[in-house]
């Protein structure tokens, strides 16, 4: 479990904190290993990875709470979490926020969608503000803060989105986000009108050019930036290996491939530092064991990656 809250990470940072979106303990591990200081749970990617269905309102609080508790317990960096529309009215939002904070989330993103099957439809302002008040009440005294999100389209509804964010801050939200931001011009417009911490959502780019840079947006008050790559990268790798292994009718491609860690073979176990577990167990007084998989030796944790102590991941 992270020794620092997301609030603490943001307060100590002198630049925009970049947080990739994750969906399970393996994706969280990969994000932590390369050095990112925080991460965001993607509701849409959880829907695909956990339940095998598209992002279309299928996920429920139990799904999100369960994976949040697993990721938070086994990771050394703080996790923010997308709680969709809070899974119902104000009372449902209150309950969801309470449970998610208890599960280990360090920030909760609550959106103003009026229909989770069509997230472009916005709730009436006052209905959304009721949910914001409920979430804030639930998080009182918790080491978890609210990210108030609007789905307003900057092309046609930017002023509406700005007003919703401004009011959310007035109600007590510590961070806001206009989730469809896609350029520096609109980000600047928001920054000039909405006080407080701001999240730049799902940064993208094309032809080698990012839509914004952290250097551009940090002076505007955007101290948190999210992005998606983990699920696509995982699927890309599995399909690459799968096509080759299917053609060979074996696992030779995987066993022979030199990956980013330099570890050979078919197992990802070394990336989860099994020998660290054995060291911790031995520190309690027992004999130091060697970790093997059905008698096969397992390599040590790869060099050049962040190795979080096992004590912080159990």
Indicate residue ranges for each PLM-predicted region.
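Extended, intrinsically disordered, low-complexity segments
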Residues: 230-314
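Intrinsic low-complexity, intrinsically disordered segments enriched in polar/basic residues
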Residues: 1-2, 250
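Alpha/beta enzyme core
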Residues: 2-226, 277-313
């Amino acid at each position: 479990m992270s020794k620092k809250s997301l609030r603490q990470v943001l307060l100590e940072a002198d630049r925009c904190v970049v947080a990739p979106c994750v969906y399970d303990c393996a994706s969280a591990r990969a994000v932590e290993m390369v050095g990112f200081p925080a991460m965001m749970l993607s509701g849409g990617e959880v829907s695909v990875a956990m339940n095998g269905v598209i992002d279309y309102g299928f996920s429920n609080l139990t799904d999100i709470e369960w994976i949040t508790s697993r990721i938070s317990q086994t990771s050394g960096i703080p996790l923010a979490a997308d709680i969709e529309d809070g899974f119902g009215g104000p009372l449902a939002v209150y309950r969801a926020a309470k449970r998610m904070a208890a599960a280990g989330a360090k920030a909760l993103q609550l959106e103003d969608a009026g229909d989770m099957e069509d997230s472009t439809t916005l709730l009436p302002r006052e209905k959304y503000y009721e949910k914001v008040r409920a979430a804030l009440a639930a998080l009182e005294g918790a080491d978890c803060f609210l990210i108030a999100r609007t789905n307003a389209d900057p092309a046609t509804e930017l002023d509406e989105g700005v007003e919703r964010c401004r009011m959310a801050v007035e109600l007590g939200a510590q961070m806001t986000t206009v989730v469809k931001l896609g350029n520096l011009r609109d980000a600047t417009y928001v920054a000039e009108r909405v006080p407080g911490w701001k999240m730049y959502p799902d940064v993208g780019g094309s032809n080698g050019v990012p839509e914004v840079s952290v250097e551009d947006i940090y002076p505007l008050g955007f101290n948190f930036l999210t992005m998606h790559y983990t699920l696509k990268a995982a699927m890309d790798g599995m399909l690459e290996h799968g096509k080759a292994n299917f053609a060979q009718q074996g696992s030779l491609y995987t066993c022979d491939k030199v990956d980013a860690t330099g570890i050979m073979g078919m197992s990802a176990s070394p990336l989860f530092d099994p020998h660290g577990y054995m060291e911790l167990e031995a520190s309690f007084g027992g004999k130091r064991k060697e970790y093997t998989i059905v008698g096969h030796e397992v390599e040590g944790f790869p060099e050049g990656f962040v190795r979080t102590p096992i004590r912080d991941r159990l």
